Amino acid sequence: ETASNAFLHTWSLGVEEQFYLVWPLLILLIAPWAQGQPRRLAWFWLLVASLSLLACLWLVQSQAMLAFYLMPTRAWQFAAGALAWLLAQHLRPSLAQAKSASWLGLGLLVLSLIAIDASTLYPSMWALLPTMASMALLWAGSTDTLPAAIKPLCSAPMQAIGRLSYAWYLWHWPILVIGQQILPIHGHLGNTVLALGLSLLAAIAT
């Protein structure tokens, strides 16, 4: 059922809008206590991340779909982004640390591609892999001298793809689902590339 729903992926828009509503309220709530105190702020986001992750790991065992789609069980990933920002602002890495973090991030991304597939219970502990990878790469990129391992990620073409990535994400799924009704896509590399190319053009146009 989900594989034939052309608008399934728009759940992320709902989570995003909830994030825009809830996150500012959290910041206002803790501002008097944490203003000018990055360590306190870090502890707060770590607490949010821990509670949300525990809820996610508990719920995914019995209601994997709810754990996947609900904002409270994905809030730990938003909190991880907040922690990455705090690290980049207040604990910038040395070049040696940035090199280590960049290779760690890339390694975790590769491991994610290998370990996570359609049969993987998700989001579970496996969701830590791409999340920690993103944190490591963001922290590594906050140094003045970029490590060689992540310089390609900061190139103009990659930045252009980054700017288009969310629009591309919004277009790719309906084109794949609708395209499957016209041409066989699953298991056909050429048609898959064609569908992804069309979704990229749609992202550029919009």
What are these regions, as identified by a protein language model?
Residues 1-206:
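Membrane-interface helix/loop caps of multi-pass membrane proteins
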